[in-house]
């Protein structure tokens, strides 16, 4: 097959899902080229691995391609897609390429509106610790690997399944995880009924001998369970779940007991705090048990989990100001981050810098966003990150700021660009503050530049590994 498919070209190769697939393909021996609008960290990593990456999209980039893979963010009028059609080059979506890779292994697909990346990463850590040598494709950088992908020789392929455009239905996993079913990606689905139907098809697509590991605490999952015709293992914190967690503490670290059919399996100490991370860990435990792993090996693997990039990630501390970055961009995810921050650091003033992600999401969930920041002490809001979307009249950062002020006592400052926010940070942040950069776009650079500013000003900046708290 490699001799027939000489060159795989990937449009949007720097994306979280695409870059992981590209890395696995390179390690399998394929020649990979690609294009993206910027040379971010994933692109730089792929370049070091031998990929040829064009910065910017151009028709000539696909001249030598035998097959073209496109990410969900790429529009049909992209010049590379247009040229590929003219040349008769096969074009496949990212999910179909992932499905082809999954056909070669026993597939484990992790789906859900929130928690996919962390749950997939927990599984990757457990299976690696168990010496199962899995192939892994994740939507974020797993700190243990220093990457979002790895090629293994073992039978399992563990992948994050993207529901945003329904393409996760291309996958053919043996085991699935569904962390939750919430309202999101309404630009594609239109409403909750279509979202539910997509997850219903996903869960019913596994073979009769497979297993759906699903969060029984989630209202969306509860809504679907009566119509699922394939085996299901429920997990959660509530009684009635087959796999149940009992939280002992989730401040600074998460400490909890695990029960299977109300029989104690053991106790877990997870470095990542928060109730949502306990649920993510329970999902990973459920899959691991279904795969036949020894409970002691599973719990040991969880204790060695080092976290995922951009998931409540410590960036540094200086002048008593702790800087944390988090990828969450849905109201439920942001609320989980804020609750975790307040639980871990009740004595610190919480300042959140939030960059909304997509005009369609901001419009569809406007009311929820307005109520999301009530527990923050101060909110620094910037303009919406478009993610290739066209603007929607009346939907912008300023309108969101006004909406938040109407329903919340949280102090809100709006900045049309990062530079204006950056210039004011030294006057806003004080010793003892917790500063969180929040969002799926480039807001993380604000925290990084603030720490660099302090360092250049002569202040000592503690690196993440030097920070004793959390």
Curated annotation (Swiss-Prot):
ATP binds at residues 112-118. SUPFAM superfamilies: MurCD N-terminal domain, MurD-like peptide ligases, catalytic domain, MurD-like peptide ligases, peptide-binding domain. Keywords: ATP-binding, Cell cycle, Cell division, Cell shape, Cell wall biogenesis/degradation, Cytoplasm, Ligase, Nucleotide-binding, Peptidoglycan synthesis. Disulfide bonds: none annotated. It holds the Pfam family Mur_ligase_M. GO terms for cellular component: cytoplasm. Its EC number is 6.3.2.8. It catalyses: UDP-N-acetyl-alpha-D-muramate + L-alanine + ATP = UDP-N-acetyl-alpha-D-muramoyl-L-alanine + ADP + phosphate + H(+). GO terms for molecular function: ATP binding; UDP-N-acetylmuramate-L-alanine ligase activity. One of its GO terms (biological process) is cell division. Gene3D superfamilies: Mur ligase, C-terminal domain, Mur-like, catalytic domain, NAD(P)-binding Rossmann-like Domain. It is found in: Cytoplasm. Pathway: Cell wall biogenesis; peptidoglycan biosynthesis. PANTHER family: UDP-N-ACETYLMURAMATE--L-ALANINE LIGASE, UDP-N-ACETYLMURAMATE--L-ALANINE LIGASE-RELATED. Belongs to the MurCDEF family. Cell wall formation. This is UDP-N-acetylmuramate--L-alanine ligase. The lineage of its organism: Bacteria, Pseudomonadati, Thermodesulfobacteriota, Desulfovibrionia, Desulfovibrionales.
């Amino acid at each position: 097959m490699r001799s027939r498919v000489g060159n795989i070209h990937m449009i949007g190769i720097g994306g979280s899902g695409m870059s992981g697939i590209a890395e696995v393909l390179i390690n399998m021996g394929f020649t990979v080229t690609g294009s993206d609008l910027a040379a971010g960290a994933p692109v730089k990593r792929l370049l070091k691995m031998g990929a040829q990456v064009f910065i910017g999209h151009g028709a000539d980039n696909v001249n030598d391609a035998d097959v073209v893979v496109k990410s969900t963010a790429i529009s049909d009028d992209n010049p590379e897609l247009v040229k590929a059609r003219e040349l008769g080059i096969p074009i496949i979506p990212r999910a179909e390429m992932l499905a082809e890779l999954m056909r070669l292994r026993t597939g484990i697909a992790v789906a859900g509106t929130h928690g996919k990346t962390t749950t997939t990463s927990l599984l990757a850590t457990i299976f690696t610790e168990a010496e199962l040598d899995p192939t892994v494709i994740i939507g974020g950088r797993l700190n243990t690997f220093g990457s979002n992908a790895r090629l293994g020789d073992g039978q399992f392929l563990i992948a994050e399944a993207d529901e945003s455009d329904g393409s996760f239905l291309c996958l053919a996993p043996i085991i699935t995880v569904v962390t939750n079913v919430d309202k999101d990606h309404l630009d594609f689905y239109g409403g909750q009924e279509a979202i539910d139907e997509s997850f219903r098809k996903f869960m019913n697509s596994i073979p009769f001998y497979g297993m759906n590991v699903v969060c029984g605490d989630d209202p969306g999952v509860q809504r679907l369970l009566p119509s699922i015709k394939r085996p299901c293992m429920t997990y959660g914190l509530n009684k009635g779940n087959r796999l149940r967690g009992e939280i002992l503490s989730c401040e600074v670290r998460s400490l909890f007991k695990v029960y299977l059919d109300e029989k104690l399996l053991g106790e877990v100490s997870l470095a990542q705090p928060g109730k949502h991370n306990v649920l993510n860990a329970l999902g990973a435990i459920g899959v691991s048990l279904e795969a036949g792993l020894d409970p002691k090996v599973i719990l040991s693997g969880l204790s060695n989990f080092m976290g995922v990039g951009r998931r409540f990630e410590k960036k540094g501390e200086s002048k008593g100001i702790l800087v944390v970055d988090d990828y969450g961009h849905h109201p439920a995810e942001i609320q989980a981050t804020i609750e975790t921050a307040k639980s871990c650091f009740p004595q610190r003033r919480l300042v959140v810098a939030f960059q909304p992600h997509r005009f369609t999401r901001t419009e569809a969930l406007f009311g929820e966003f307005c109520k999301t920041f009530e527990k923050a002490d101060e909110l620094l809001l910037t303009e919406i990150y478009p993610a290739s979307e066209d603007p929607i009249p009346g939907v912008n950062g300023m309108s969101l700021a006004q909406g938040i002020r109407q329903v919340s006592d949280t102090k809100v400052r709006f900045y049309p660009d990062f530079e204006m926010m950056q210039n004011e940070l030294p006057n806003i942040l004080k010793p003892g503050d917790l500063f969180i950069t929040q969002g799926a776009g480039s807001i993380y650079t604000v925290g990084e530049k603030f720490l660099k500013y302090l360092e250049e000003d002569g202040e000592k900046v503690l690196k993440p590994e030097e920070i004793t708290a959390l």
